[in-house]
């Protein structure tokens, strides 16, 4: 799936998570949840799907960021 197709199929909540992640290169689950005004469980579910699709990655300290491939539209 290409980046445009992934974005087209995202829910409003997932788009909100992606938007916040663009402005915060390394963000914790709690910070992301608070910024998006979503429950931590919902945010974690969305972020894990993003990890599976190669949109996001989890860093060594439990912080999340968008992958360079996704940011550059290579996926």
Predicted regions and their residues:
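Short amphipathic alpha-helical interface segments
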Residues: 10-38, 45
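Intrinsic disorder/low-complexity segments enriched in polar/small residues
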Residues: 41, 45, 70-72
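Short, cationic-aromatic polyanion-contact patches
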Residues: 3-14, 28, 58-75
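Glycine-centered, phosphate/nucleic-acid-interacting loop/turn motifs that mediate DNA/RNA or nucleotide
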Residues: 54
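Basic amphipathic alpha-helical segments that dock to polyanions
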Residues: 49-50
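Residue-level "edge-of-site" marker
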Residues: 45-46, 63
């Amino acid at each position: 799936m290409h980046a445009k197709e992934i974005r087209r199929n995202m829910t409003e909540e997932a788009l909100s998570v992606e938007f916040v992640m663009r402005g915060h290169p390394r963000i914790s689950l709690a910070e992301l949840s608070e910024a998006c005004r979503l429950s931590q469980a919902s945010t974690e579910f969305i972020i894990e799907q993003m990890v599976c699709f190669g949109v996001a990655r989890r860093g060594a300290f439990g912080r999340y960021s968008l992958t360079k491939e996704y940011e550059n539209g290579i996926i």
